[in-house]
């Protein structure tokens, strides 16, 4: 795509120098996003390619293909009512069966597609995991199918961070009987394993951890985790509803840009009874009862065995060592 035509350039130059220089920079940024995510004609409502097939905007919010099969994937049984008990059981079931993982982006370099059909095929049919935009995206589709009043929100990860962090995460807000709850099944860090009441200023217990919400000066919410008598910040977000299309640009950057942490390190995590299992690059870490056991996975066979045994991931593509 050309930077701009003569008519557009003339319009820029008629403005003060600083303004049109900034406008050109913004124009370049927009063009870069458009080129990187292979936008098609806006008049056709198409966005990205799945092979040779264009994916339409509407497919990002398409209904869940098969609720029963999704529930079987996460081992969920029992009544399905849009209440808090069901929500918490769904969150826990998902966290213990569907791993956070970036194998497609790190090991394969494959595009991460966010339409419902692609997410369902990857997570449910293939038995894979994914990262935040995939996991929370499909989970929101499940909740909507069940009848929950819910919507996604954009999130900044501020855990172990300094300075102003960009939007790189998503989560969901669910309203039950007039009360808003925050839920997240796609954070690779120390996330709550149940829904948290958004407007409760006190500490809330979730599994072995305690969390608390606070409001930042800009009006955003910040989630803190209580650690050793103190607090560490985890996530910062605005409760404004988003659309799934809003996650296309950050998803493209995080999954494809060489500067993204997801392109520089293998990250896998799953909750276990009383702990968790994680792989960072080629190191397996098992957290159990406050103890951590580390194992170096220095061969591809060891890595594949760990992926299958601890995360339920059976993959056939080559893995980096």
Per-segment meaning from a language model:
Residues 5-6, 27, 52:
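Acidic/polar hotspots within intrinsically disordered regions
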Residues 56-129, 144-166, 187-321:
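Mixed-charge, low-complexity segments
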Residues 170-172:
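Short beta-strand scaffold segments in enzyme catalytic cores
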Residues 174-176:
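Active-site beta-strand termini and strand-to-loop segments that position acidic
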């Amino acid at each position: 795509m050309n930077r701009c035509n003569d008519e557009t350039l003339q319009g820029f130059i008629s403005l003060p120098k600083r303004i049109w220089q900034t406008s050109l920079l913004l124009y370049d940024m927009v063009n870069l996003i458009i080129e990187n995510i292979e936008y098609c004609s806006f008049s056709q409502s198409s966005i990205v390619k799945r092979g040779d097939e264009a994916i339409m905007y509407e497919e990002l919010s398409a209904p869940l293909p098969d609720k029963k099969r999704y529930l079987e994937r996460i081992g969920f049984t029992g009544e399905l009512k849009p209440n808090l008990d069901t929500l918490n059981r769904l969150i826990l079931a998902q966290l213990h069966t569907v791993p956070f993982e970036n194998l497609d982006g790190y090991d394969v370099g494959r595009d991460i597609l966010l339409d419902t059909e692609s997410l369902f095929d990857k997570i449910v049919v293939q038995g894979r995991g994914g990262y935040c935009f995939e996991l929370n995206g499909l989970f929101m589709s499940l909740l909507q199918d069940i009848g929950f009043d819910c919507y996604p929100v954009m999130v900044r990860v501020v855990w172990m961070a300094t300075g102003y962090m960009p939007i790189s995460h998503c989560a969901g807000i669910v309203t039950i009987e007039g009360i808003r709850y925050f839920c997240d099944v796609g954070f690779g860090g120390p996330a709550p394993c149940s829904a948290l009441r958004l407007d409760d200023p006190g500490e809330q217990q979730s599994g072995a951890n305690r969390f608390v919400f606070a409001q930042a000066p800009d009006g955003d919410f910040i989630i803190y985790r209580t650690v050793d008598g103190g607090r560490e910040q985890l996530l910062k977000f605005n409760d404004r509803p988003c659309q799934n299309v809003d996650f296309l640009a950050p998803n493209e950057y995080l999954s494809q840009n060489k500067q993204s942490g997801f392109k520089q390190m293998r990250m896998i995590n799953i909750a276990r009874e009383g702990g968790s299992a994680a792989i960072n690059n080629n190191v397996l870490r098992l957290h159990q009862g406050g103890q951590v056991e580390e194992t170096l996975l220095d061969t591809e066979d060891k890595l594949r065995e760990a992926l299958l045994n601890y995360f339920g991931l059976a993959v056939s593509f080559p893995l980096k060592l």
